[in-house]
């Protein structure tokens, strides 16, 4: 598949083995995983970091192999666990990381106003932000009146 803002193809990478159920050797139950996720979140880890810690330190390949106990038709995810326990961030993490990148790039452009390559990069990042905001408004993760404002973003990131 092609890249979003370039006319190049994507780089190939390793693929996760196709699996529909947790491995037999895995000793953790859904409750154990939920407790671990909540504990790690309270320690201040992001969802991406929680997934990495579960994989590397606890041997849990992915949380999505388990079924949600509240709704057996849905896969369990770290975000759903955090929402269930009231620990999910107000702004989704992928959007927050893009906003942080945009704020840092704006700070760079204040010091280097003629850096046109970075200016273009900022335009691309902000278009990704707008696209993601539209998606999250549609899904109900953000309020309908939420807007991305670069000045407010500085305060949001701090």
From Swiss-Prot:
Provide the alphabetized UniProt keywords.
Ribonucleoprotein, Ribosomal protein
GO MF term set: small ribosomal subunit rRNA binding; structural constituent of ribosome
User: Do you know which Pfam families this protein is assigned to?
Assistant: Ribosomal_S13_N, Ribosomal_S15
User: What Gene Ontology terms describe where this protein resides (cellular component)?
Assistant: cytosolic small ribosomal subunit
A Gene Ontology annotation in the biological process aspect, one of them, is: translation
Describe the subunit structure.
Part of the 30S ribosomal subunit.
Q: What is the protein name given in its UniProt record?
A: Small ribosomal subunit protein uS15
